[in-house]
């Protein structure tokens, strides 16, 4: 669509694509404006555009946000991001939830143009009276649009001074360039030839879509010595400890009846015994499907009790939604058209090479897409009626993107607070598109990014333009993934990855047992756990671990506390990396308003590393020559840091510094590590 501008043009004039003042390449933009950019309530983000005009006259620009009712808010002035680039930007802040829009307005700035000429001509004595009269007329025009009496009086006083022939020309000009006049014109600039970009959509969602700490656990493992298989009632006893560690979301694997046909045994064996509990993702049996509770976990009333107890502790429930079936699911006989049938009439089981899932049937989506979408929405709404507002969707990349777009639009159309997390470890294009069509959060490649270069490159990508549509959830481990870094690095590796996940991403999580540093693989070279909880009950002695000091729960608790106390860690976009002289040491900072957090991590879980951290002081909101006290929030120590700083990080003792930058008024209570 063509840009629009406000002028005295007649209706016979044809609109142009560019507009009178060109406004080009407005960002953020998602799928050329077909999908909304994303933010959460209170989140700040940059809107930028290329703005210029013919000749040498000055231009200005501003951003206008319109709320879900279409009402424009106060516009935000933009600035040229780098001199001579014509790239303008401004930071705006999202308001209430809903669908907003934003536009960039560009305009000719006659006052700035006049000031530039006047500063040259008046000292040179060129066209003095004419130049001053031009200024007076511009200021009169500007004053006419100023609503406040005091501000208008300030500009009119400048007009009088410009026309006061009893004063020297330099004095008349100076009266029009005072800080007071500047302040009024900054609030109420004189704008000519205002040209607006096309509006772009902005979806503002609740904060949990961006920020939170997740804890995954299997309720069935929370039994008692007399009744090993846990229920929702026994699992609810674990909730206070989870809340005490500072988590916000409790994520449950599927809670539905588990099939018996081709049931997997321990460690993924193909021959299950009568005591094997099966894989929760093999959903469905004669006892019910996706809308039913596994009888061994209890009843729907027991689930409601679990949700209620979680809510009392400030915990939300995230429920796994795996759109697949065991061979025993009621759908297999009721809806045969929903499955792939081979020439011999059998149904093909699921595969994700090299993994095979003989106990699971995948869904075929093209024979009855309407029926599948209707049933999916019904199931989701069933669990929403029982207090679930977050769904972790299993392998959405193996289903049609259009299907998810339809389902999420239906749910969020009436319940915009419901959050969908895409568990899709797949190609970048698919992951990006799933985020763009509605998934509020995404799993990421974080597990496989372990070196300084890998982390820097990946987080630079995630915190850049991708942040306008894709929100990462950094799980440090999952029931499926035990990375070699954790297998071979021991407890220090678990500490390092927890610090990275909790401070790099506003949303992070762990799967139960991470705090105990469980790291025995199924076999060398495998990322599967030995005695994986996917296939068996796994009771843990939390009390003994705390008593013997074999848990890193205190570190996890401290990290979540730091996140809650520091707004900088609850956002993604303002992330900057700082140079260090060791590949094993990574440094980065985050800022939100006056809150700045600086993190330095030893990526080597086996060896002590010493390094010099060279801080980019302007990125911390400081001048290059300044030094400030920083408090390590992990230890309580305070250091005085400047541009170059020595650090010594010892695995098992000091895996990292997580520092808040203090203002000079804060007392220094520790030694100086400045070099």
UniProtKB/Swiss-Prot annotation:
It catalyses: alpha-maltose 1-phosphate + [(1->4)-alpha-D-glucosyl](n) = [(1->4)-alpha-D-glucosyl](n+2) + phosphate. It is an enzyme of class 2 (transferase). Optimum temperature is 30 degrees Celsius with maltohexaose as acceptor substrate. This is Alpha-1,4-glucan:maltose-1-phosphate maltosyltransferase 1. SMART domains: Aamy. InterPro entries: GlgE (IPR026585), GLGE_C (IPR049171), GlgE_dom_N/S (IPR021828), Glyco_hydro_13_cat_dom (IPR006047), Glyco_hydro_b (IPR013780), Glycoside_hydrolase_SF (IPR017853), Ig-like_fold (IPR013783). Maltosyltransferase that uses maltose 1-phosphate (M1P) as the sugar donor to elongate linear or branched alpha-(1->4)-glucans. Maltooligosaccharides with a degree of polymerization (DP) superior or equal to 4 are efficient acceptors, with DP6 being optimal in the GlgE-catalyzed polymerization with M1P. Is specific for the alpha-anomer of M1P as substrate, since the beta-anomer of M1P gives no activity. Alpha-D-glucose 1-phosphate cannot serve as a donor substrate, but alpha-maltosyl fluoride is an efficient donor in vitro. The record marks 480 as: Transition state stabilizer. Homodimer. It comes from Streptomyces coelicolor (strain ATCC BAA-471 / A3(2) / M145). Belongs to the glycosyl hydrolase 13 family. GlgE subfamily. Alpha-maltose 1-phosphate binds at residues 264, 324, 359, 395, 534-535. Pfam families: GLGE_C (PF21702), GlgE_dom_N_S (PF11896). Its EC number is 2.4.99.16. GO terms for biological process: alpha-glucan biosynthetic process; oligosaccharide catabolic process. PANTHER family: ALPHA-1,4-GLUCAN:MALTOSE-1-PHOSPHATE MALTOSYLTRANSFERASE, GLYCOSYL HYDROLASE FAMILY 13 CATALYTIC DOMAIN-CONTAINING PROTEIN. It comes from the Bacteria. Optimum pH is 7.0 with maltohexaose as acceptor substrate. The active site is at residues 394, 423. One of its GO terms (molecular function) is alpha-amylase activity. Is competitively inhibited by alpha-, beta- and gamma-cyclodextrins (cyclic maltooligosaccharides), unlike GlgE from M.tuberculosis. Keywords: Carbohydrate metabolism, Glycosyltransferase, Transferase.
């Amino acid at each position: 669509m063509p840009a629009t501008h406000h002028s005295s043009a007649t209706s016979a004039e044809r609109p142009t694509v560019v507009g009178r003042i060109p406004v080009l390449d407005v960002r953020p933009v998602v799928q050329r404006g077909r999908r909304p950019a994303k933010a959460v309530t209170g989140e700040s983000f940059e809107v930028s555009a290329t703005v210029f005009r013919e000749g040498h006259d000055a231009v200005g620009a501003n951003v206008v946000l319109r709320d879900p009712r279409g009402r424009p808010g106060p516009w935000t002035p933009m600035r040229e991001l780098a001199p001579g680039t014509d790239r303008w930007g401004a930071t705006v802040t999202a308001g209430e939830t809903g669908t907003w829009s934003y536009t960039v307005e560009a305009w000719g700035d006659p006052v700035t143009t006049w000031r530039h000429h006047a500063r040259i001509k008046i000292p040179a004595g060129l066209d003095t009276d004419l130049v001053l009269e031009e200024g007076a007329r511009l200021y009169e025009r500007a004053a006419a649009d100023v609503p406040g009496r005091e501000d208008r009086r300030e500009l009119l006083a400048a007009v009088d001074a410009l026309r006061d022939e009893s004063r020297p020309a330099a004095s008349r000009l100076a009266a029009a360039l005072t800080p007071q006049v500047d302040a009024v014109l900054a609030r109420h600039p004189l704008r000519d030839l205002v040209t607006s970009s096309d509006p772009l959509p902005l979806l503002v969602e609740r904060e949990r879509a961006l920020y939170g700490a997740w804890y995954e656990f299997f309720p069935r493992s929370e039994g008692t010595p007399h009744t090993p298989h846990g229920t929702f009632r026994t699992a609810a006893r674990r909730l206070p400890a989870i809340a005490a560690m500072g988590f916000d979301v409790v994520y449950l694997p599927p809670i539905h009846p588990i099939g018996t046909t081709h049931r997997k045994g321990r460690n993924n064996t193909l021959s299950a015994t009568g005591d094997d509990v099966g894989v929760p993702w093999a959903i469905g049996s004669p006892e019910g499907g996706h809308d039913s509770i596994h009888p061994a976990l209890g009843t729907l009333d027991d689930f409601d009790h679990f949700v209620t107890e979680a809510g009392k502790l400030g915990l939300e429930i995230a429920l796994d939604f795996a759109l697949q079936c065991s061979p025993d699911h009621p759908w297999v006989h009721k809806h045969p058209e929903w499955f792939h049938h081979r020439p011999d009439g059998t149904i093909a089981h699921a595969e994700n090479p090299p993994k095979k899932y003989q106990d699971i049937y995948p869904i075929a989506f093209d024979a009855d897409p309407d029926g599948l979408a209707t049933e999916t929405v019904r199931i989701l709404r069933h669990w929403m009626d029982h207090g679930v507002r977050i769904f972790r969707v299993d392998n959405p990349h193996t289903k049609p993107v259009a299907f998810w777009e339809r389902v999420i639009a239906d749910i969020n159309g009436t319940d915009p607070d419901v959050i969908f997390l895409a568990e899709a470890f797949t190609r970048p294009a698919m992951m990006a598109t799933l985020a763009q069509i509605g998934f509020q959060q995404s799993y990421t490649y974080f597990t496989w990014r372990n070196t300084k270069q890998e982390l820097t490159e990946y987080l630079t990508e995630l915190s850049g333009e991708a942040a306008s549509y894709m929100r990462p959830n950094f799980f440090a481990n999952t029931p499926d993934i035990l990375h070699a870094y954790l297998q071979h690095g021991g407890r220090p590796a678990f500490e390092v990855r927890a610090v990275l996940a909790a401070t790099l991403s506003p949303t992070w999580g762990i799967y139960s047992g991470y705090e105990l540093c469980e790291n025995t693989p199924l076999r060398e070279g495998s990322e599967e756990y030995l005695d994986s909880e996917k296939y068996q009950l796994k009771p843990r002695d939390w009390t003994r671990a705390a008593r013997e000091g074999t848990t890193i729960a205190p570190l996890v608790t401290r990290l979540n506390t730091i996140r809650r106390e520091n707004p900088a860690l609850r956002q993604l976009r303002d992330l900057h990396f700082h140079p260090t002289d060791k590949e094993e040491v990574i440094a980065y900072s985050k800022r939100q308003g006056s809150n700045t957090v600086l993190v330095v991590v030893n990526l080597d879980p086996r060896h002590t590393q010493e390094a010099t951290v060279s801080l980019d002081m302007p990125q911390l909101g400081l001048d290059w020559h300044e030094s400030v006290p920083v408090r390590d929030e992990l230890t309580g120590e305070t250091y005085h840091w400047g541009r170059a700083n020595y650090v010594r990080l010892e695995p098992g003792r000091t895996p990292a510094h997580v520092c808040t930058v203090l203002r000079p008024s804060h007392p220094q209570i520790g030694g100086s590590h400045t070099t």
